[in-house]
Amino acid sequence: ERHRAWWKKFWSVSEISLDDPVIEQRYYLSKYMLASVARDPEYPPNILGISTFDRPAWNGNYKINYNHQSPYLNLMVSGHFQQSDPHDAPYLKLMEISDEMCKRLLHHEGLYYPLGLGPHGLVSEALLLHMKSPAIHGALNMIYRYGITEDETYAQKVYPYLRGVADFWEKDLVCRDGVYHVVGDGMHERTDGNIRDNGVPEDPVNTLGYLKTFFTWMPRISEALDLDEKKREKWLEIAENLAPYPKGTIREIQENPTLWKEVDVKLEDLLPEEMLDKEIYYDEGIGGKWSFHFPGNVMQIYPGNA
């Protein structure tokens, strides 16, 4: 009876009706899976979801470069906050370590997170791969949660984390002629060899988007909580003066090394001639401007192998 009552309550929160029965079935199937594994606030589901293996890929951890963040968006917009809130646990438990890591590696304060986290403050995979965005990417889920609910109790819980992320970027952004640039942060995973080939990455399109949203919302949240009044002007100033999203044409990046090392086919062979000169957004302003492998960092692979 308790089992039935739990599911009845869960399904009564929201519903959808679609013209396509296959997509509708997949929607409810994904909800069923996430509701089954995302119940313990201290132990959110890892990258493998419902799957188990003796030697799990990616160490079976919380991969916080989009894999961990993305599934919870669908829970939040459908009102299932009890299942979406476990997302936050790995971030909140690692704040002390990540602050120390930032001081040692970047020589300033703030929250600087590695790629693979475990529960209870465990670093499962101490890889950085030339990325600085994982912490702010996770912060966006928290901001969306507050934006949907305006739950000040929740905001109080996550605010120390959000403030730590703000501290990181206030100190790490490079201001040139009044414009804030992201330096040393790849759009996605970057090897040392890739950095040697393409240079230190700057102004990744995804991180610029994260920063715009983050620093636009931080003054609102701090005002709701009556905290950090003196910081709000600075946060808005950053949001309004970020570097523009990198863009150009396909023809202009035909010689970009990242185009040719991943696949044998040339990008120009996949597109009609008239599209080669249309303006597009690049992955990074400096560095790997295009990738067959990780286009725009919008794909995600959760649950891997399921």
Predicted regions span which residues?
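Acidic/histidine-rich catalytic neighborhood
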Residues: 164, 168-224
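Secondary-structure transition/capping motifs at alpha-helix termini
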Residues: 36-41, 78, 82, 145-156, ...
